[in-house]
């Protein structure tokens, strides 16, 4: 749930989940217009169903990616740490740092940039102190979170997302997955958010799956 709320799942604020998570308290989500429907029950532990590895999909817009390239960057000790520090010193938290052999991308929330001059100042510092070969900035990005504890036991979850993006002619800007394998993050252009969200729901939650999950919820 924490991963979903991070990427725009609007029912809860991230901070609202902490006390119930710490005290192992189940949470019920219901439709205010149809409260008689069972809705969704959130618990700390549940029996995993390998047929439905994905628990939820959410998205959030308002991200900017700064891509920094330099030949032999991977051999330069402290390059990534210093790049992040320059943003932190300017009051801009770095959300994600996907990297390649000769490049890194710093993903930030666009709202944390006060003005074009603010960002230009940070980039000028990076250019002066780290001497990269190039710096590129891409705005108006969207991050998708695909979450599910059973994902680690299933092959093809990431492939289904990539196939969905490809079928809708959507270019993936970033992919990130932690070692726990309970969540994956994909970054795309914000203009493709709606069609991507519809495609991912169709890929992970076909009608028969929704019917089965609803029946299980009614039986609890």
Predicted regions and their residues:
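C-terminal catalytic "cap/lid" subdomain
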Residues: 1-220
